[in-house]
C-alpha cells in the first residue's frame, strides 16, 4: 500500500488513553503507533519511549505526559498518555491536554477497577465529551461469558456517570499481542483489533467545534484611553470573532453587565475589519469610560456569558513537593481564585462527609466568590495563596 502523506487538510482531534494502572494504556498507545506506521500513518513509538514521559508545567503544576501523533485515512490525531494516576488527574483538571474524546482501556482479566471509575467520573466532570472502550488482554481470558460480563460492567459504569453506556463502542483485543506482531494488517488475528478500535474512534468521536465558530469572548488584560477616540481594551481573543460594528457585552467584576459597540479593531498597530480566536488585539469601545472597564472583565457576544459568584468545581490540591501547602485546609478556607487574568477571593465549602482536604487530594467543592466573574462550565482556574499556586480547578456546574 502506498505511504499516506501527512495532509494538513485532514481534520485534527485531541484524544488520549485513560483507565486503571497496568490495564495497558501505554502498551495500547504503542500498538496504535506501530499498527498505523505500517501504512505510513505514524512513527512507531516504543512502550519505553512513551513511558518516560517528559515533565511539563501547566498553571504552575508539574505533569508528566507523553504525546504521540498519528493519522487514519480521514483524520489526524494528537494522543496523550500519562504514566501515573496523579498525572491524569492533574492533566484533566488543568486542561493541559484538552481531549475531544478518550479511549478507556479496561483489562478483560480484571474488569473495572477504582481508577477506571475515577477516570470516567473525571471525564464527566471536566467535560471529555466522548469515550470509546478498548477491552484489553483478551488473550488472557478463555471464557467468552467472562468477556460479556466485563463488558456489561463497563457499560453500567459509564451509564452511572451519565455517558451513553449502551451506545458506546466497546472493542476487544490484546495491545501486547498486536505490538509484538506488528504486521499492522487488517487480516491479522491481533492487529485487526487495533484497526477496529481506530475505525470506532474515527466514526464515533465527532469533530469538535472550532474555537473560531464559538461565540466571541476576549478576556480584558489592559485598558487605556486614546484622546479623541475613546477607551481601548486589549487582550487575546479566546474564541469566536469580532468585527467592527459588532455589539459586545462587558461582563464581570460588577453585578450588572454593560453593552457597547466595538468601533475599531487593531493588531500590531494595524487596523483590521475583524479579529478571531488566537489574535492579540486592541478594541475601541463606543461611549465607554475608562473607569467602567478593568482587567478581569471579558468582552463577549451579548447574552453568551453571565457574571456569577457561586459555582461547583473539581479541584486538585498541590503537594508540598509541588510548591503547594504543607498542611490541610478545611471548609471556610478563603484563598484567591485566578480566572483568566485576575485573582478574586472566594470561600470554599466542602461536600458533606469531607472534613478536610490534604495536599495531593482531588475534591469536589462549592465556591462563593466575593466579586462576580464571567463564569461558565469547563472554565479552568488556579487557587492561589499569597501569590503562589496551591491548587487547580475546573468549573463543573453553576449555582445561579
From Swiss-Prot:
Question: Chief location of this protein?
Answer: cytoplasm
- In this chain, the stretch annotated as G4 covers 136-139
Reactions that this protein is recorded to catalyse:
GTP + H2O = GDP + phosphate + H(+)
Q: What class of enzyme is it?
A: hydrolase
Alphabetical list of SUPFAM superfamilies matching this protein: EF-Tu/eEF-1alpha/eIF2-gamma C-terminal domain, P-loop containing nucleoside triphosphate hydrolases, Translation proteins
Q: What is its EC number?
A: 3.6.5.3
UniProt xrefs under Pfam families: GTP_EFTU, GTP_EFTU_D2, GTP_EFTU_D3
Q: Which residue windows are coiled coil?
A: none
> Region entry G5: which residue ranges?
174-176
Keyword match Aminoacyl-tRNA synthetase: no
Region of interest (G2), residue spans: 60-64
Q: Where in the cell is it found?
A: Cytoplasm
Record: residues binding GTP: 19-26, 81-85, 136-139
tr-type G domain location: 10-209
The segments labelled G1 in the record are 19-26
What UniProt keywords are attached to this protein's entry? Cytoplasm, Elongation factor, GTP-binding, Hydrolase, Magnesium, Metal-binding, Nucleotide-binding, Protein biosynthesis
Task: Identify the GO cellular component terms for this protein.
Answer: cytosol
InterPro entries recorded for this chain? EF-Tu_GTP-bd, EF-Tu_GTPase, EFTu-like_2, EFTU_2, G_TR_CS, P-loop_NTPase, Small_GTP-bd, T_Tr_GTP-bd_dom
Q: Does the keyword Methyltransferase apply?
A: no
Role of this protein? GTP hydrolase that promotes the GTP-dependent binding of aminoacyl-tRNA to the A-site of ribosomes during protein biosynthesis.
Q: Which HAMAP family match?
A: EF_Tu_B
The similarity annotation says: Belongs to the TRAFAC class translation factor GTPase superfamily. Classic translation factor GTPase family. EF-Tu/EF-1A subfamily.
Question: PANTHER family, alphabetically?
Answer: ELONGATION FACTOR TU, MITOCHONDRIAL, ELONGATION FACTOR TU-RELATED
Q: What is this protein called?
A: Elongation factor Tu 1
Amino acid at each position: 500500500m502506498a505511504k499516506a502523506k501527512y495532509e494538513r487538510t485532514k481534520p485534527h482531534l485531541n484524544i488520549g488513553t485513560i483507565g486503571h494502572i497496568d490495564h495497558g494504556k501505554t502498551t495500547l498507545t504503542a500498538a496504535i503507533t506501530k499498527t498505523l506506521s505500517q501504512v505510513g500513518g505514524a512513527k512507531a513509538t516504543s512502550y519505553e519511549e512513551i513511558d518516560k514521559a517528559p515533565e511539563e508545567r501547566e498553571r504552575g503544576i508539574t505533569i508528566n505526559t507523553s504525546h504521540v501523533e498519528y493519522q487514519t485515512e480521514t483524520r489526524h490525531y494528537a494522543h496523550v498518555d500519562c504514566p501515573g494516576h496523579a498525572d491524569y488527574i492533574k492533566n484533566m483538571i488543568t486542561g493541559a491536554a484538552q481531549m475531544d474524546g478518550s479511549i478507556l482501556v479496561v483489562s478483560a482479566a480484571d474488569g473495572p477497577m477504582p481508577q477506571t471509575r475515577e477516570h470516567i467520573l473525571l471525564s464527566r466532570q471536566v467535560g471529555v465529551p466522548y469515550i470509546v472502550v478498548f477491552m484489553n488482554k483478551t488473550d488472557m481470558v478463555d471464557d467468552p461469558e467472562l468477556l460479556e460480563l466485563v463488558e456489561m460492567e463497563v457499560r453500567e459504569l459509564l451509564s452511572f456517570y451519565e455517558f451513553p453506556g449502551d451506545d458506546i463502542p466497546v472493542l476487544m483485543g490484546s495491545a501486547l499481542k498486536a505490538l509484538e506482531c506488528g504486521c499492522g494488517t487488517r487480516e491479522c488475528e491481533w492487529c485487526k483489533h487495533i484497526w477496529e478500535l481506530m475505525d470506532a474512534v474515527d466514526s464515533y468521536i465527532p469533530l469538535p467545534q472550532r474555537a473560531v465558530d464559538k461565540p466571541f469572548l476576549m478576556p480584558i488584560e489592559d485598558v487605556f484611553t486614546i484622546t479623541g477616540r475613546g477607551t481601548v481594551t486589549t487582550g487575546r481573543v479566546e474564541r469566536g470573532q469580532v468585527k467592527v460594528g459588532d455589539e459586545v457585552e462587558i461582563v464581570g467584576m460588577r453585578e450588572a453587565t454593560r453593552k457597547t459597540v466595538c468601533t475599531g479593531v487593531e493588531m500590531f498597530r494595524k487596523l483590521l475589519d475583524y479579529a478571531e480566536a488566537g489574535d492579540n488585539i486592541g478594541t475601541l469601545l463606543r461611549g465607554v469610560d475608562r473607569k467602567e472597564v478593568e482587567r478581569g472583565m471579558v468582552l463577549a457576544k451579548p447574552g453568551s456569558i453571565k457574571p456569577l459568584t457561586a459555582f461547583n468545581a473539581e479541584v486538585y490540591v498541590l503537594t508540598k513537593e509541588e510548591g503547594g501547602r504543607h498542611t490541610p485546609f478545611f471548609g471556610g478556607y478563603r484563598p484567591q481564585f485566578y480566572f483568566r487574568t485576575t485573582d478574586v477571593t472566594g470561600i470554599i465549602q466542602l461536600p458533606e462527609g469531607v472534613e478536610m482536604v490534604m495536599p495531593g487530594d482531588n475534591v469536589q467543592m462549592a465556591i462563593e466568590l466575593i466579586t462576580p466573574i464571567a463564569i461558565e462550565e469547563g472554565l479552568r482556574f488556579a487557587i492561589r495563596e499569597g501569590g503562589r499556586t496551591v491548587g487547580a480547578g475546573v468549573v463543573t456546574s453553576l449555582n445561579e
